Regions:
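Serine-dependent protease modules
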Residues: 1-174
Length: 174
């Protein structure tokens, strides 16, 4: 969402605009951390552990689809740990939701009914370009790792990696 922006302004729920700058961004993860030019302590969401999220849970997707203003839609978690299927620049594993997500929702919160952050909306699979019930969010655990690295002053996001890759076993290999 921030890309190469030089003039960053965040619009709060009450309509106030606050200027800020990018502390850390990563196009591959489709995430950015902003530092806002204010001394005010702003409300924030608690990050929910991704391993506690279950298929069928109710969620709310918050965003600014098509620039129409702040919008909230609802749905459920449709799938966990989806890989290789999200459109756009984001790569990794995702939560799948049927909450309507459209262009402009990227970077918005996906929250549970308790108000905890489950994920950050990132992309959709759609032939029409609009929502058809297949949306994806970056899990809160990855968001938390990104925030931790931003607070530590990292200049780029270092992704978790196990250093191995799985593959199906063929008859010849066995």
């Amino acid at each position: 969402v921030v890309g190469c922006a030089t003039d960053i302004r965040v619009v709060l729920h009450d309509g106030r605009e606050i200027s800020g700058n990018v502390i850390l961004s990563d196009e591959e993860s489709d995430l950015a951390v902003l530092k806002l030019d204010t001394d005010e302590i702003l409300p924030h969401l608690e990050l929910r552990k991704s391993d506690t999220v279950e298929v069928g849970e109710l969620v709310l997707a918050i965003g600014n689809p098509f620039g129409v203003g702040q919008t909230v839609t609802n749905g459920i978690i449709s799938g966990l740990a989806r890989t290789g299927i999200a459109s756009g620049s984001a790569k990794g594993y995702f939560l799948q939701t049927d909450a309507p997500i459209n262009p402009g929702n990227s970077g918005g919160a996906l929250i549970d009914i308790s108000g905890s952050l489950v994920g950050v909306n990132t992309s959709i699979l759609s032939r029409s370009g609009g929502s058809n019930g297949i949306g994806f969010a970056i899990p809160a655990d990855l968001v938390g790792q990104f925030l931790t690295q931003a607070k530590a002053g990292y200049s780029g996001f270092i992704r978790p990696w196990a250093g191995m890759r799985g593959q199906p076993i063929t008859f010849e290999m066995a």
